[in-house]
């Protein structure tokens, strides 16, 4: 497995190592998701959200940008705080139950994306800073599947998340994508970690 040593694999949940992902139902509570969405919609209504510039916060409504029909925030204080506060809970969820010892995770970055109708996510795997990643559904108007490559079967698996559900995945190893969104909006938080050597 690229980028993750045998020693690191032994620290991780066997399903995470074998399949490349774990579904964590109700990882965030409903009130927490509601709060995060309230903050997101307040940010969307702010003057800074008008006009998209590639690589910055804003809504990308044209076809030339990397993330068509999305509004993105990278490293915002609320998401960075969440990245650090959830570190131990994420390590607990990722641990190998046989050892009982959570892996040591180092936070790398946080990212939030609000997808608008027609948005899609191209097939990709993540950069080296994303060894263990979570994508967390904060809210939606409609269900929207994410497809992840199952490392065992080498086939795509459809995952449907409800608000509060998290998908933990080995970001450098697992390809993933979303088809065009058939709904008004879908709010997703990404938190990324690397494993201690």
What spans do the regions from the language model cover?
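Catalytic core of non-heme Fe(II) oxygenases with the double-stranded beta-helix
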Residues: 114-174, 185-189, 196
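Conserved double-stranded beta-helix
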Residues: 64-72, 82-147
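Short proline/glycine-enriched turn/loop segments at secondary-structure junctions
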Residues: 178-183
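Short amphipathic alpha-helical segments
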Residues: 3, 193-197
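A short, polar/charged loop/turn motif at coil->beta-strand junctions and beta-hairpin connectors
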Residues: 15-18, 106, 185
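Short, well-ordered beta-strand micro-motif
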Residues: 23-25, 168, 192
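Non-heme Fe(II)/2-oxoglutarate
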Residues: 1-93
């Amino acid at each position: 497995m690229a980028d993750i040593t045998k020693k690191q694999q032994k620290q991780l949940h066997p399903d995470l190592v074998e399949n490349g992902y774990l579904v964590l139902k109700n990882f965030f509570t409903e009130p927490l998701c509601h709060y995060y969405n309230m903050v997101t919609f307040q940010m969307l209504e702010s003057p800074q959200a008008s006009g998209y510039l590639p690589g910055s916060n804003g809504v990308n409504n044209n076809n030339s940008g990397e993330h068509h029909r999305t509004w993105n925030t990278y490293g915002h204080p609320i998401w960075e705080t969440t990245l650090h506060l959830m570190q131990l809970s994420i390590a607990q969820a990722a641990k190998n139950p046989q050892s009982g010892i959570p892996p040591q995770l180092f936070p790398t970055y946080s990212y939030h994306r609000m997808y608008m109708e027609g948005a899609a996510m191209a097939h990709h795997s993540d950069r080296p800073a994303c060894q263990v990643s979570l994508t967390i559904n904060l809210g939606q108007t409609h269900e929207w599947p994410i497809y992840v490559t199952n490392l065992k079967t080498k086939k795509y698996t459809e995952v449907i998340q409800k608000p509060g559900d998290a998908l933990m995945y080995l970001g450098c190893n697992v390809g993933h994508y979303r088809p065009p969104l058939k709904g008004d909006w879908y709010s997703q938080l990404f938190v990324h970690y690397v494993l201690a050597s």
